[in-house]
């Protein structure tokens, strides 16, 4: 037996809670931006995040409502996606506080920054991965805005690379689940994709 839900009858807020409970786990884009005046560095977690394209390399995140991150990206055309590692759990959550626009999360939460190579917004110094992006385009959908950025530089900390490739067991990325739940890396399984020429498997 299944329980059926009608989005229209349930209402937007209740269906949001349902969607975020079943579309799991969701990787977190910890997005750093600069305000238009260049004086305030903002940092916020966004869990509606994924890769949109690999050639050209495009990542996307969704701003639910018009928040500082979106305004800054629209004004400057640049942002950095920092990987949200498990060891910074409390700080990541704290950067989700609705600070006023003039108060940057780096300073408010006490997060060390480092300069980016290709864009103006800083990177999170303690994050093992930073994807420096320039704005490709935005798409307004209802009250949300989909932000697509072209990755112009990627910086990966050396100690998380195994055999030339970032290793998830060393990256230890956080994810968002339903309600106030967060996920961490548990069991990792390796299973190669089966090419059609080898189907059915013996």
Q: Over which residues does each language-model region extend?
A:
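Basic, polyanion-binding surface patches
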Residues: 1-202
């Amino acid at each position: 037996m299944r329980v059926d839900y009608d989005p229209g009858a349930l209402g937007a807020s209740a269906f949001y809670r349902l969607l975020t409970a079943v579309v799991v786990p969701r990787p977190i884009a910890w997005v750093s931006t600069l305000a238009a005046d260049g004086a305030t560095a903002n940092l916020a977690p966004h869990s509606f995040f994924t890769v949109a394209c690999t050639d050209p390399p495009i990542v996307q995140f969704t701003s639910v409502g018009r928040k500082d991150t979106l305004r800054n990206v629209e004004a400057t055309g640049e942002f950095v996606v920092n990987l949200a590692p498990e060891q910074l759990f409390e700080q990541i959550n704290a950067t989700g506080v609705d600070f006023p626009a003039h108060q940057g999360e780096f300073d408010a939460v006490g997060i060390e920054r480092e300069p980016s190579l290709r864009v103006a917004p800083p990177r999170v110094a303690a994050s093992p991965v930073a994807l420096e992006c320039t704005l490709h385009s935005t798409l307004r959908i209802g009250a949300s805005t989909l932000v697509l950025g072209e990755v112009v530089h990627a910086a990966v900390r050396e100690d998380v690379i195994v055999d030339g490739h970032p290793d998830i067991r060393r990256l230890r990325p956080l994810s968002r689940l339903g309600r106030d739940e967060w996920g961490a890396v548990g069991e990792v399984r390796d299973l190669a994709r089966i090419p059609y020429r080898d189907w059915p498997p013996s």
